[in-house]
Amino acid sequence: MAAPDSETALFETLDRLHVKRQKLEHKPVFTVAESDEIHHALPGIHTKNLFLKDEGGAFWLVTTPADATIDVKALRHKIGSKRLSFGKSEAMAELLGIEPGSVTPLAVINDTGGKVTLVLDTTLTGETMVNIHPLRNTATIGLSGSDLVRVVVDLGHPPRIVDVADG
């Protein structure tokens, strides 16, 4: 789980960087399918996240549009990794301080050891509103794609920007 002060630190970072955002508190959601109500309440593009580990032991956090189709076998070639599989929830908790359902690119705030490589789908970077969790699945915040990139760079995790989705 996220450290008690992680969300506070995250919002302090957003404020320091003057990131404009919308925030919606809601019931817990664990899957993209469960988040339909949020999609109607918040304009913009909604996301899904994959926490992956390659056979070399490297961890990857991949964020794409919620409706994107992702071929994990093809993804490894796009990001230059070895064979990929889904990372275990224990590793996600240890490295990113979050649990399944709360996955977000903003969780890199907790990866102080730099063990996770963040990958953002190219589509997200040009969007005016990208909706993501703020380290918990009971809220969603919307910020611009360019601000998302600025924030994760400020957190020491410059993302790899790749055409992740198939098609």
Put a short name on every predicted segment.
Residues 1-167:
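Extended, low-hydrophobicity, polar/charged segments
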